[in-house]
Amino acid sequence: MSIPDENIILEGSLKRCKKYKLFKTKWVEHYFVLHCRDRERNLFAIDEFKTSRKNDLKKRFKLEFVIRVESNLSVSDPSILCTAGGGHQEESMLNCIFGVGFRFENIVKDLYLVAKNDEEMTLWVNEICKLCKLHRQHDEGDSSHAAESSISGMSMSSQSLDMSIIEQQQYAENIPESKQYHRMHHFKSVISHNSLPSNPNYNNLPDPLESSRSETSSMYSSRRTEDDSVSYTSGPPVPPPRTRHTLNRFVKNGQVGRLHMIPASTSMGQVVKVEDAEDSSGETLKLDTPEQYPESVTSSEGFPVYERNGKTLIRRAPPPVDRSNKPKNLRGEEEAGTRYRNLSRNGVNENGNYSATFSSRTSNYQQSETSKRRNLDYFEPTQMIENSSLSTLAATSTRSPTPSDIEYISVDVDRTLAFKQMRRAAQSTD
């Protein structure tokens, strides 16, 4: 492809920065021609040839995509992503560098060229700027100021920002003290009405404005603790922490639990009337005088503690139960046990041998009856056992009461299971 001589504007040998390996570049000397490729539309281009014969076109750069032209660049400039491959000798020859930036859609690519001298570099830069209608950004100053990189521009913007801050501070110093105090006072009051202090030591923070501090601190009433002098905002009362000497625990199969987690036995003082005889056992609680206990001694946990028969009782036993209205089909084995007991009493008076034989049978029967009525076992209240090392609570159980004492007890299933586990734990420790 040959270019007519009338279309050629400028031509000559220039060195171009070219990438030939990964992360490696080198400067290659090619022949460049600046010409008009379309006079009707006034379009220009720079063609790159391998030699001055202009018979092998390497690449064409269209000037309608030019966005900027830079001159007087150096190899050490960070904007040039190309190094001198020949060391210091090659770097000394790369003095007259200029760059042309092209924009393709959203991508900007730079073409860096090296001229032989400053006059040739200036000629190329002026012709490209005239054809692309570009203007110089810096009309004053030397040529080295025009070659400053983007880093210097960032430093200038930061300097201007610092100057604006200094001017604001100087302006604030010139404000009269009365106006400045009024403005600070208004700012403090707005903060105190719209927001709460995030720091618990808000009232103790130093503040030069005593009046605003008094206004703000009057909104929050503070109290001081006995341990330290740190003030806190007032709020709901906090319950006192539990003291260490009242740690009441029980050990169950290697597990440690709290005593208050076990439901306490309730004592009912009123008669519970049965309305439906089919759904219930037909029993009522007797209105009897409660069993007399000695005066209670309030423990550290807040519940009464009684002493009876040399044992420390924490809770009182439930009232007796009336079984007069219980259906006959629910009595069953208990009546038979009563009949055998009556016979055993008579046998003691009449014949000693018979009573001994019958008493053994009765004891076996009572044991089988106890095993069948495990869901109705009655437990004594929890006793306090004091050891030399640690004061603990252990629940001990007794045998099932006879029907003459308490004929029938309705015990909650969950409560019974809890007491049974405590009994097994006590037996295993023994």
From Swiss-Prot:
Domain writeup: The PH domain is required for fluid homeostasis. The C-terminal domain is required for fluid homeostasis.
InterPro entries: Gab1-4-like (IPR046355), PH-like_dom_sf (IPR011993), PH_domain (IPR001849)
PTM text: May be phosphorylated.
Organism this protein belongs to: Caenorhabditis elegans
Biased composition annotated in UniProt, kind: Low complexity: 192-222
Gene: soc-1
Record key words, sorted: Phosphoprotein
Complex and partners: Interacts (via C-terminus) with sem-5 (probably via SH3 domain 2). Interacts with nicotinic acetylcholine receptor.
Domain PH: 7-133
Gene3D superfamilies: Pleckstrin-homology domain (PH domain)/Phosphotyrosine-binding domain (PTB)
Keyword Acetylation appears in the UniProt entry: no
Polar residues: bias regions: 341-369
Function: Adapter protein which modulates signaling mediated by several receptor tyrosine kinases. Plays a role in fluid homeostasis, probably downstream of receptor egl-15 and upstream of let-60/Ras. Involved in nicotinic acetylcholine receptor (nAChR)-mediated sensitivity to nicotine and levamisole and gamma-aminobutyric acid (GABA)receptor-mediated sensitivity to muscimol. Regulates synaptic levels of nAchR receptor subunit lev-1 and unc-38, and GABA receptor subunit unc-49 in the nerve cord, probably downstream of egl-15. Regulates motility.
Extent of the signal sequence: none
Pfam family, one: PH
SMART domains reported for this sequence: PH (SM00233)
GO BP annotations listed: dauer larval development
Start and end residues of each stretch annotated as Disordered: 192-246, 275-303, 315-377
UniProt-recorded name of the protein: Multisubstrate adapter protein soc-1
Phenotype for Y408F: Likely abolishes phosphorylation. Weak rescue of fluid accumulation in clr-1 e1745ts mutant. No rescue of fluid accumulation in clr-1 e1745ts mutant
Effect of disrupting the coding gene: Causes a decrease in synaptic levels of lev-1, unc-38 and unc-49, a moderate resistance to paralysis induced by nicotine and levamisole and a mild increase in uncoordinated movements. In addition, forms ectopic muscle membrane extension during larval stage. Rescues fluid accumulation in clr-1 e1745ts mutant. Partially suppresses multi-vulva formation and partially restores fertility in let-60 1046gf mutant. Prevents constitutive dauer formation in daf-2 m577 mutant.
